[in-house]
Amino acid sequence: MFQKAIPLWHDAGLNTHLIFRADGDFSGAVFRIAAADFYKVYADGAFLGFGPARAAKGYARVDEYSLAACHEVRIEVAGYGCSSLSTVRQQSFCCAEIVRDGEILAATGFDFACMRNHQRRQKVVPISICTFYYFEFITNKIRIIPT
């Protein structure tokens, strides 16, 4: 499926959230992604998709999205690193590629910038097997804890 992309992850422990971003002229291209545990994709700031569909431990589904007039692709990946009712305990990763007419325009490990999402606090208490961790967002020194 992937010709050039390399699966990446920052091993910072449990409950890690990373952002991958690529800029360029991606008009008419196809975006492919496989990730664990969950991802959200944005094209030029507009929500494009969420995934992946569930798969057995050790397997990952590759999703494809068509990009129209697009110049920026941003992927937000949540890696919980624990078992729950919707995930298995496995290594988190993100592997993505943007291809147009057989030419690879961007691939993880080469063209995507990666950073940790510091808007979410990482070290929080797990709640239960149903809900992973509670989310604690950091916004201008005000702590918002959704229930």
Regions found by a protein language model. Name each.
Residues G49-K57:
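A short acidic/small-residue loop/turn micro-motif
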Residues M1-L48, R61-P146:
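Beta-strand-rich recognition domains
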